[in-house]
Amino acid sequence: MKKLLTLLLISGIVPFATAQNEADKWFFGTGAALDFSSGSPVVISSPMNTSEGTAAVSDATGKLRFFTNGVDVYDSTKTIMPNGTGLMGDVSTTQSALIVPNPAASSQYYIFTAGADGAGDFRYSIVNMTLNGGLGDVVLASKNTLLTDS
């Protein structure tokens, strides 16, 4: 009886579950990008030129928020954000940037950057999505904050 009740409960909830689409857009290479929001990859344009190590984030509906190569940060209109140049990641580092939502502030994201291979520095910058008319801004006071240095 317990198994039947569990099955009925799950089958009643599943149709109401919604997908998380925060990773629908991928930006990489020389002007290359893909949009997976339709279920199949669709080529879209990108102003970014990089050899490796990019990161992008969309909202839960799949709408692009911003993307970066670890050096420049682009908003959803594919324009560099205010204070969005000069991050200290390295475009030839395999994973030069990682975007993580700030658990304490839903309108903010951390961009973690890694410098050139062997340099050993690991930094973060904060993007505040309430600034610049909702397109986001790299918060100058947090830009390139050093976490580790070897």
Tell me what each language-model feature is.
Residues 1-24:
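Bacterial Sec-dependent N-terminal signal peptides
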Residues 20-94, 101-104, 114-140:
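Beta-propeller domains
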Residues 84-85, 142-150:
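Surface loop/turn signatures of beta-propeller and other carbohydrate-active proteins
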Residues 11-15, 99, 131:
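Intrinsically disordered, low-complexity boundary segments flanking structured domains
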Residues 109-111:
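Hydrophobic beta-strand positions that form the internal "hydrophobic ladder"
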